[in-house]
């Protein structure tokens, strides 16, 4: 299907183990877009364990256009002490380049918002790179507030091990 062809159906469904390869492919595409491909150490096996292992740590949705996998959203629950409620955190939302501008990202976000409301979450939140103005503008158009005073703090790899042993 070319970008010019119209899409007759767009369906959102929970990911299944058979989708892991599709999701990993899109994770790599997203990393290239975000100029972070050097950071991807994920494998199909590790993703499968995270999504479908004995104790899953995340969930995923798949977006299909006319039966073709064209998008995914990966999310998990966090917790707000201020609200004393769980929240829904969107780790990734990705729509393949050829399928952008068709409203699929909009539909995926709305679907996730419904999940958050159904699960009585106090928040639905995610991060966005500060240079990704198309995404920032899209999220603002959906009602998201971009929090200017917050920064992500991350400890991983050797610094994480050192901190744990300190």
Feature names for model-found ranges:
Residues 11-23:
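A short beta-loop-alpha structural element at the N-terminal edge
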Residues 24-49:
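Conserved GNAT-fold acetyl-CoA-binding loop/helix
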Residues 50-62:
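A short helix-loop-beta-strand connector motif used in the catalytic cores of GNAT acetyltransferases and
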Residues 62, 68-76:
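Conserved beta-strand in the GNAT
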Residues 93-100:
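A short, internal acetyl-CoA/4′-phosphopantetheine-binding micro-motif in the GNAT/acyltransferase core
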Residues 106, 110, 118, 130-149, ...:
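Conserved active-site alpha-helix within GNAT-family acetyltransferase domains
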Residues 117-127:
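Conserved GNAT acetyl-CoA-binding A-motif
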Residues 126-135, 154-157:
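Conserved beta-strand-loop-alpha-helix junction that forms the acyl-donor binding cleft
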């Amino acid at each position: 299907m070319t970008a010019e062809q119209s899409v007759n159906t767009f369906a959102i469904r929970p990911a299944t183990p058979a989708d892991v390869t599709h999701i990993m492919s899109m994770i790599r595409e997203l990393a290239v877009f975000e100029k972070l491909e050097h950071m991807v150490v994920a494998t199909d096996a590790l993703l499968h364990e995270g999504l479908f292992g004995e104790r899953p740590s995340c969930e995923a949705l798949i977006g299909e256009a006319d039966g073709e996998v064209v998008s995914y959203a990966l999310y998990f629950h966090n917790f707000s002490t201020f609200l004393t409620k769980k929240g829904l955190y969107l780790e990734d939302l990705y729509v393949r380049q050829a399928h952008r501008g068709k409203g699929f990202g909009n539909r995926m976000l709305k679907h996730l918002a419904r999940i958050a409301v159904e699960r009585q979450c106090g928040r639905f939140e995610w991060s966005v790179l500060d240079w990704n103005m198309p995404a920032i503008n899209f999220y603002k158009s959906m009602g998201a507030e971009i929090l200017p005073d917050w920064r992500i703090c991350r400890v991983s790899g050797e610094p994480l091990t050192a901190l744990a042993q300190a």
